[in-house]
Amino acid sequence: MATYTTSDFKPGLKFMQDGEPCVIVENEFVKPGKGQAFTRTRIRKLISGKVLDVNFKSGTSVEAADVMDLNLTYSYKDDAFWYFMHPETFEQYSADAKAIGDAEKWLLDQADCIVTLWNGAPISVTPPNFVELEIIDTDPGLKGDTAGTGGKPATLSTGAVVKVPLFVQIGEVIKVDTRSGEYVSRVK
């Protein structure tokens, strides 16, 4: 199995910590005036989702995580699982609610997602960065509403609630950034 030293650390690197795959969110090399140099990292455990701050002495080795990121197409959902299909091999993968997490509110039929597999099973699902969804419920816009600083909540076709400008109406399709959950623009 491959190993990484602290000099290899960078955001996005996946490694094993306490028997669980983790990803580095942030890292910083620290050389104090007195004492040994170390690398300060913020890691996120891929299965539990916990975020931890961990310090590694300079030169420490960690085991590489045997995880794989696949570009899969979202197919459908039943009572307990969400199903994804590989676009070339047509292999099916099923993810449970824990693996889906907050991505559920951004999943559209036939959407391309990044699914992270560990030991052949999905442990996390990343939706596309931007999705286009229809507004099914929001307060009506009144005459004089502008695109200023104000906003109102809008319920989208997937059930997600997003703050939108006052001029947006029910039935319109909007573009949303799934990473932040923010309104981007109207779709013409």
UniProtKB/Swiss-Prot annotation:
- GO molecular-function term, one example from the UniProt record: translation elongation factor activity
> Which keywords, in A-to-Z order, does the entry hold?
Cytoplasm, Elongation factor, Hydroxylation, Protein biosynthesis
The cellular location(s) given in this protein's UniProt record come to: Cytoplasm
Q: In which pathway does it act?
A: Protein biosynthesis; polypeptide chain elongation
- One of the GO biological process terms: peptide biosynthetic process
Assigned GO CC terms: cytoplasm
Asked if the keyword Ribosomal protein belongs to this entry, the reply reads: no
PROSITE patterns this protein is in? EFP
SMART domains, alphabetized:
EFP (SM01185), Elong-fact-P_C (SM00841)
Signal sequence span is none
On modification after translation, the UniProt record reads: May be beta-lysylated on the epsilon-amino group of Lys-34 by the combined action of EpmA and EpmB, and then hydroxylated on the C5 position of the same residue by EpmC (if this protein is present). Lysylation is critical for the stimulatory effect of EF-P on peptide-bond formation. The lysylation moiety may extend toward the peptidyltransferase center and stabilize the terminal 3-CCA end of the tRNA. Hydroxylation of the C5 position on Lys-34 may allow additional potential stabilizing hydrogen-bond interactions with the P-tRNA.
Q: Which residues carry this modification: N6-(3,6-diaminohexanoyl)-5-hydroxylysine?
A: K34
Chain segments annotated as coiled-coil in the UniProt record: none
Described function: Involved in peptide bond synthesis. Alleviates ribosome stalling that occurs when 3 or more consecutive Pro residues or the sequence PPG is present in a protein, possibly by augmenting the peptidyl transferase activity of the ribosome. Modification of Lys-34 is required for alleviation.
PANTHER family found in the cross-reference section: ELONGATION FACTOR P (PTHR30053), ELONGATION FACTOR P (EF-P) FAMILY PROTEIN (PTHR30053:SF12)
Q: Which family does it belong to?
A: Belongs to the elongation factor P family.
Name used for this protein in its record: Elongation factor P
From which organism does this entry originate? Pasteurella multocida (strain Pm70)
